[in-house]
Amino acid sequence: SITSNCMIVNLQLGVWTGHRLDKAASKKVTDDAGAEDDAARVNKHLVPKEALKAISNAQGQIRLHFYDRTLPWKDNGDRILTRVMFQRFIEEHGALKEKFNDAVIDFLKNEYPVVVQKAEFRMGELFKRDDYPTPRELKDRFYANLDIDAVTEAKDFRVSLDKADREQVKSDIEAAMQ
């Protein structure tokens, strides 16, 4: 049955964007333009896009792997994975997560301190030191977590599918893993 041959997986990814709304600059822009207060917003890019590129690429690889190797189950992001494919999936996910974590560590140790040091010049009058979290504060903003649960919803029609339909679901999942 699906309850004994499959599991539910859900991926949560988080990345600090390096963007920050500047209310004072937004007010200045609208005042200078003679516009209403809600006519414009100034969103500062605290770090150059290039600085987060390795992290963004690693995050994209994790997401792509997750969607390639699983099938939709619920609208909340839950996806289904066969137990047969689980070990391979976890090994691949682990390798991708390691690359992601390595990119985060490299950014926090090597790139971020340099970016912050250059920010006063780069940002001009928009620079505010308080906009820049410490590396320790930033660390928790980057994550790639995988929740794994059993298929336990006895009321769910997919759990009580006949053998042919269960085999089709299993086949679809395994084909997604190819």
Predicted features, each with a name:
Residues 132-163:
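Acidic, low-complexity proline/glycine-rich segments
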Residues 156-178:
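A contiguous, surface-oriented mixed alpha/beta subdomain in the mid-to-C-terminal portion of proteins
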Residues 1-134:
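Leu/Val/Ala/Ile-rich N-terminal alpha-helices, chiefly Sec-type signal peptides and the beginnings
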